[in-house]
Amino acid sequence: MFCVAGCGRVSRSHVAPKYSIYVLGKGNDAKEYVLQTSSLDAGKLSPETAGVAVNKDEIDRELIVRNGYYYHFNALTDEFCKYEIAGNRLKPVSRLSLPGFRLENYEWLAADSLLLVGLDASSFAQAQYVLLDVAKMIVRSQGSLNIPYPREPFKSMSLGFVYRRNGLLFTGYSYHHPVGASDYTTSDTFYVAALGWPGMDVRHIDRDARSTYPGGINTVQSYAFTDEAGDFYFMTCPGIALGNRPDLPTAICRIKDDSMTLDKNYFLDLSDSEIANHGYGLWYLGKHKAIVRSERKDLFKGLGDHWSTPHFEFYVVDLLSQQVEKLALPLDKGTRKECVIVAGNRAYIAVNSTQEGNYIWIYDADTGALTKGLQLVGDTDYMLRIDVL
């Protein structure tokens, strides 16, 4: 069940859907929707007529989308679930119990081989992994990542990315200590561990005190990629809504293809560039260029309005020359969103603008042109994620 762009009601068509859009509706008791469409280039869609409503007790926007299926870990039930759109709902296909596990990041190792990394549910201090066969929905293996536990004054940790290359598994992490009853802050250092795969023995650990909080939860937003040369890039995220160390800069870092160590000679300091703010989201355009989504600290008051105030800008960053170029897009709202899809020389960018409406904008990487594509209308407040099916 899906909608070709431009239709107003849920309908069937011989044109297969290519994209998925996750929408948060309006109001205090907002509904959430999943829409599928064959095109992001033009037309209008209304989630209440062209999409399916989501059962918020079972699922939220923290999704892994692949080959028409939606995968979600439910921390309330300790279940990893596989869904598909059938009839007029998002229907569970199968479930796996993963007791005591809390998902932080994932990496596809093969078509049906999905690696989950996360933390123990009781202390958030022990790094763990689960390797799944999602075709059969079975656990192939699971265990611990042998990286150091937090030490005083730190109580917990976060895993910001996971990346496998040949016989190595890389993960970035940082440590946290609580501030009051419901907040935390982060160490002034981030770490990158190279582990043997699949044995998980530690081969090397880098530490870097120039920034902190490497990556983020990639079921919510992208923060890392591999380029054509096999070099791996990731963004540190010390802003108030992630690492909560705004005194440290947001930066792009690199692990070269022929190395198991952090490239200490590469540190693209975005906070010291024209951007001069903290970043939330990183997507690869190709040809050594990437899109960065950045906050505007002069436009929001604090964490309380960080998500609701339109203040996010988009920049194209040249990873080699380290030059940045601001895209002429309306200010976006929503702290963390999976809002960019790159297809060939085009980038589709979902922007929720209070002035110009909710559009998928199309950026031509060859010419620099920006045009409006698909518009989301009706009960649309935020486009929280866009995915290739």
Stretches with model-predicted labels:
Residues A16-N28, V65-A75, A111-S123, G167-H176, ...:
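Short beta-strand elements that form the blades of beta-propeller/WD-repeat-like
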Residues A16, G27-E32, A75-D78, A121-A127, ...:
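Short, solvent-exposed loop/turn segments at conserved positions within beta-propeller repeat blades
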Residues L35-L40, Q126-I138, Y184-M200, D247-M260, ...:
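Beta-propeller blade signature
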Residues V34-I138:
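Post-signal peptide N-terminal segment of secreted/secretory-pathway proteins
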Residues Y163-D298:
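Acidic, serine/threonine- and glycine-rich low-complexity intrinsically disordered segments
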Residues K44-K56, L90-F101, I138-P153, D201-R210, ...:
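Beta-propeller fold detector
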